[in-house]
């Protein structure tokens, strides 16, 4: 379109829009943000606001939509959640200062990953932006949180990119426009940047200038070895500068993260363990929602971070444990005080980018004074000593804010009443002129009534017409000659006098001057706070850590969590362990033991559907995870050896977007585990092979279990319905059979959820189907077919020889296939003997005795 054919204001808009073609432009016009042309159409649809027209361009009506300035946050929040970026264009010039339109410019760009406004953010979630820079060998990652000042980088590989993004939970991902990452093809929140912005040399130059250093070796970054990571960090920092229209001063020193710092968990594991999100995508009930007793939002965010980043450094874990133990008698008063603490972390971020509001500073002031009053007994905890020493360091900042900001300032700076009385003499004088106006008006009204003798005379004020003298219609004709008519009403006339006009000019001028001066003073306070940002961030981190540690103490005291022990030898010993989430959802939870060590590395877990196999496996993984966060664990006792990674293969789901079936997803996850698990890994495998035919599934399940035993040698919990797999312990001493018990009462079934030695006698699938409400006719038919299949299987035992067709790596036949056929009876006799030997009749309750009797009976049937 021709710019000469449009108004000067529209020319200005088109020039700004041309620089931000990929964003919606909020163009400030008075008390509204307006959008034009395609932006207006899109915004009207997304925000459900009115689409209208105004004027014409090239003969076509200009489409237009707008949102009120004071309500812009709620609309921005909706757009950001939809993955949109918005350029905020403000009026920066004085209205009427020149012949053309008022000067406007984009003051910031709101993108999903660069939010700082509390109204646009989830209180308990960390908002991160991640830069991804793929190279031939490695992928450079850099991520930051403008709210916390976090700034980190890492080298990773293509096969681990999904896992890293799942861990970081990025709100926005930056990617070079010349590079492709298959994992990001369907991802939302991806922003493409020019590839040159990811150049390592440009990145190093920008980073060294920002941190004021000669090179990046002090951050653990080598220019050659970490070039791709440095490029990602540089691109990220530059993007933040462009979107915020300034270089924020609160980003922590850049740090290089390595795999050895935390226990590794892939994307499937984080999903299956439901750490911060359920399998259905909800926020509750999850591990996070169940454990989150934090008093502050900062604490809740740090808790989520710790849960997703379990430590491997035993010294750091023990430091947290000692702090938790020291707080067990102090956590209640501490949490009461922490409830009065504002979100210092996010307030500091808003100070850094220059958009903090008056009440942010008031909340910061009150919080700093509150933190300084925290009095804790460290009880030998060096971590507590370090944390509590931080708070007095901010008292000088708190005192400066007390002097500068009113106890209860206005919400908006434009409304005035923000700067404290006595802070600036000129402001106090301007306020005196405004505030003593009532006395002048009362005196003027009394004097004018006496002078004119008009009883209906009143001196008043409104925002539209300013100050005026009002007379009734009957007395208006008697107004003195110096009364100048200002407004005519139905029953009254309004006048102005030279004396009243002079006072009005003085008051209005004082008001304008006071507002301008308050803005100037407030900006000065914000500028002075820039130097205090490192200490403010330090206080925020210390308060959040205290909040999480006191939450861990509350869990230990109120939910009977115990301090786990750590061993240098391979072991996972848990006495009466409980699932931390499930036990809060049910009236009675059955606790269970877990014993894995160098002799028994794989637990083959059998039992009925709904018997609790998946819950038990997740329980073990969550106890291990919690132990490495420094939290006490839901058990009577726990001893855990070295753990480097946790893997899970639980549940069934497809990936239609990538054209992968349920079985393909299952096999992909299984393959990843077999390629990456080590002797120090914990592996959870649930129903491997169920997505294909019986023989294929059984063969695959056997092969996977054997691979875990012989190659990976990981600690493994392997749940299966393939009863044939229960022969594995006879061939592999490191495998052990355990089962979840159930009790049959006629045609009904009672799940005892108790882990017992040996394999399960049956799966109770039809009984579970009955509980699910299958029609009686279908159940009878299923039972009939089951009886026929069992009879056929009994008459044709050789079908178990399926493994004999599978060549081993050495070319000979696998020993398990022949063993199943030849030693079946001996195996069952061994199981019966072992089960009887472990029974102590004198210690069993009637219910347990009956359960054991039924179990032994089922085993005897199998032998016969």
Swiss-Prot record:
GO biological process, one term: mismatch repair
Lineage: Bacteria, Pseudomonadati, Pseudomonadota, Betaproteobacteria, Neisseriales
A GO CC term assigned to this protein in UniProt: cytosol
Protein name per the record: DNA mismatch repair protein MutS
Keyword annotations of the record: ATP-binding, DNA damage, DNA repair, DNA-binding, Nucleotide-binding
SUPFAM superfamilies: DNA repair protein MutS, domain I, DNA repair protein MutS, domain II, DNA repair protein MutS, domain III, P-loop containing nucleoside triphosphate hydrolases
Pfam families from the UniProt entry: MutS_I, MutS_II, MutS_III, MutS_IV, MutS_V
Organism per entry: Neisseria meningitidis serogroup A / serotype 4A (strain DSM 15465 / Z2491)
Molecular function in Gene Ontology: ATP binding; ATP-dependent DNA damage sensor activity; damaged DNA binding; mismatched DNA binding
Annotated InterPro entries: DNA_mismatch_repair_MutS, DNA_mismatch_repair_MutS-lik_N, DNA_mismatch_repair_MutS/MSH, DNA_mismatch_repair_MutS_C, DNA_mismatch_repair_MutS_clamp, DNA_mismatch_repair_MutS_core, DNA_mismatch_repair_MutS_N, DNA_mismatch_repair_MutS_sf
Purpose of the protein: This protein is involved in the repair of mismatches in DNA. It is possible that it carries out the mismatch recognition step. This protein has a weak ATPase activity.
